[in-house]
Amino acid sequence: MTVLSLSQECLFDKRNQRSVLHVIFEGSMRVGFCNTCCKRWFFAFDGTECQNSNIEARLRGSKSFSGMEYRHVRLEGYCAHSAGQVSVELWVEDCTGHRRASAIPFTLVNVNPRITVEEMTITEI
């Protein structure tokens, strides 16, 4: 069973039909209280993952919590999307092929996280 949850969301007004969205997440993530679990963080746009490239990060859990063991992550990529208001979302789910831990895995994305969204033309990339 995959558990999917929305971690962060922001609205962006994309003006040009031919441009792409450049998205960056910078922050600390952790999966804990398990040694077989794995979590996948990914960007979605209006509830759908980017069709031309996945923008994702995967972290495996550690068996025990031993203090502030967060990993700094920079998750970055580009996605083509139609013009208009876009909901840019950071989601987290179980990795495919990994069973859930008997205890609830600890996932944290609130240690000074930052999402940056900018509209770019193909020539700017």
How should each PLM-predicted stretch be described?
Residues 1-125:
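Extracellular jelly-roll beta-sandwich "head" domains, especially the C-terminal globular C1q domain
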